[in-house]
C-alpha cells in the first residue's frame, strides 16, 4: 500500500485514520472497529464489505 495514498484515506464511517494491516491485506479503523479489504491493491472502503474487529484484534 502506497504510504502517500494511506495518508489521504480515512474511514468512511468515522472519518478517522486507517492503518494498513499487511498480513491480512486490510485497512483497519480502530475507532469504527472495522477492517476494510484491499483487493488487488485497491482499497474497498464500503461499510458493507468491511468486517467487524473483535477485542483481541484491536489490542494488536
Swiss-Prot record:
Q: List, alphabetically, the GO terms of the cellular component aspect.
A: cytosol
Q: What is this protein called?
A: UPF0434 protein Daci_3569
Q: Which Gene3D superfamilies match?
A: 2.20.25.10
Q: Which domain of life is it from?
A: Bacteria
- List the Pfam families hit by this protein, alphabetically: Trm112p (PF03966)
Q: Which InterPro entries match?
A: Trm112-like
Write out the similarity annotation: Belongs to the UPF0434 family.
Amino acid at each position: 500500500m502506497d504510504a502517500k495514498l494511506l495518508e489521504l484515506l480515512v474511514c468512511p464511517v468515522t472519518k478517522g485514520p486507517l492503518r494498513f494491516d499487511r498480513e491480512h491485506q486490510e485497512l483497519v479503523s480502530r475507532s469504527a472497529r472495522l477492517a476494510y479489504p484491499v483487493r488487488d491493491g485497491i482499497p474497498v472502503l464500503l461499510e458493507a464489505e468491511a468486517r467487524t474487529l473483535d477485542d483481541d484484534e484491536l489490542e494488536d
